[in-house]
Regions:
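Short, flexible helix-loop junctions that flank or precede catalytic/ligand sites
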Residues: 1-116
Length: 116
């Protein structure tokens, strides 16, 4: 996702904690919450963004997950088992970056698949 320009970003009071929580339901975002919005300056060529960052989803394959794959590779069951094993979806990783003030909700929504 694109990273907000640190020179010109402005605090975004319009993006509420509830709006961010809605895109990552049933997970919750704890801790600080500093949403910013892009503005544009000479440094970022009037885009409001400077650089990019990766969002990552890591799956540790447990014995239970291996059993799900071997017995009946049902996609829904595999997703549920992955979440039980501690996998965090891409959208949740993006929401954490929004809470840190590094990118915007719109960037995360455009770059990540919806939660099922």
């Amino acid at each position: 996702v694109r990273t907000l320009c640190k020179q010109c970003r402005q605090k975004d009071d319009a993006t509420s904690r509830e709006a961010l929580a809605a895109i990552v339901k049933p997970w919750k975002i704890n801790g600080g919450y500093r949403p910013y919005k892009p503005v544009g300056c000479i440094d970022c060529r009037m885009t409001g963004f400077m650089g990019r960052m990766g969002l990552y989803e890591l799956l540790t394959v447990s014995d239970a997950f291996k059993g799900q794959v071997t017995l009946a590779p049902d996609l829904g069951a595999l997703k549920r088992q992955a979440v039980q094993d501690g996998m965090r979806p891409l959208r949740l990783a993006g929401a954490l970056r929004v809470a840190e003030g590094l990118t915007t909700v719109e960037e995360v929504l455009s770059a990540t698949p919806p939660l099922d």
